[in-house]
A protein has these predicted regions:
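Bacterial N-terminal signal peptides that target proteins for export
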Residues: 1-9
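Outer membrane pore-forming secretion/assembly proteins and partners of Gram-negative envelopes
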Residues: 2, 72, 79, 92, ...
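Bacterial N-terminal signal peptides
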Residues: 9-18
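Boundary at the C-terminal end of the N-terminal hydrophobic targeting segment
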Residues: 21-23
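Immediate post-signal-peptide N-terminus of mature secreted/exported proteins
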Residues: 25-65
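Long, charged amphipathic alpha-helices with heptad-repeat/coiled-coil character
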Residues: 31-36, 60-70, 82, 86-131, ...
């Protein structure tokens, strides 16, 4: 009985070691996800996304879903989610591009997207304020695209 337990424990240790070694060598497509999720850009985006989700939870009891505050928070969160999808699509060989600066650009662009959304709800597309907001968003999109190309 003791001999069987020792064999079982040895097999479990060997199995755990092989799983750990496979994770360390990065076999399969999980390597890319691990390196992307440990990048400074991902951390920056995740930090802002978490802050927004916490704000939505905190304001949920005080504001309705149709309130301006909730609409703006959700617009910024949606922009971050779209950007996060793009970041997760980066090839593992290009994770060096995922710097903190890129993360800050993406977070700032999400805030500008929310401003543009607010402007579009108030004014027409041709209004000077809306055009200004659109140009800001376009500048940040161009900077992000330049880094990721």
């Amino acid at each position: 009985m003791i001999f069987a337990k020792r064999i079982f424990v040895s097999v479990c240790i060997l199995f755990a070691g092989s799983v750990f070694a496979a994770a360390q060598t990065g076999s399969g497509s999980t390597e890319g996800i691990f390196s992307i999720k440990s990048s400074p850009a991902y951390a920056e985006i995740l930090l802002r996304k978490t802050e927004l989700q916490a704000d939505i939870d905190a304001f949920g009891s005080d504001y309705t879903e149709a309130s301006t505050k909730m609409i703006e928070l959700r617009a910024e969160l949606a922009s971050l989610d779209r950007s996060l999808t793009k970041v997760l699509a980066v090839r593992p060989s290009e994770t060096g591009k995922l710097t903190q600066g890129l993360g800050k650009l993406i977070v700032r662009k999400a805030a500008l997207d929310a401003d543009l959304d607010r402007s579009l709800r108030r004014y027409s597309k041709e209004h000077p304020e809306t055009r200004r907001a659109q140009r800001r968003v376009d500048r940040f999109e161009a900077a992000i695209a330049e880094i990721l190309k």
